Amino acid sequence: LSASKKNMDNLEEKDLIEKTTRKDLLKNKLVLIGEKEMKGKIDNVDQLKTENIKIALGELSTVPAGKYAKQVFDKLGIWNEVEKKIIYQKDVTAVLNIVDSGEIETGVVYSSDALELKNGFVIAVFSDEDHDPIVYPVALIKDSKNKETALKFLEYLSSEKAKNIFKEYGFE
């Protein structure tokens, strides 16, 4: 199970997975979050370019959510206005924590991460059409020592029971 389609693509290119077992198991949404003091002050993405608001994003080179956020801001035509306001973080958890603590006004995380907000709130959910699909692929590794058990586990991950659990944690 990978949080990165690109990483799974690399495994497939290197012929390290059983290609017939590969599938996109989960999906996620990208959301704009705000710290509690922003409630009532910001209610849409356009305000990011006009207001004096800092934005926490994951590093573009290493954090998929950061890359997706840039795609959204490019698609909405606001990247040039918001780029100078961005404070980059090492991962999505760091983005969530710095916004939830009130150190930075807004940030972009996955909807599954936003469920962990204690003080902050979700300002907006970005359209899936504004960024590459956020999918979590799964596949059996070719040199798996216990393929039968691994296949049963993959089957379980696709079951209704597992899907309901994933939904509780913000995945689709």
Task: Annotate each PLM feature.
Residues 2-27, 31-172:
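Exported/periplasmic ABC-transporter solute-binding proteins
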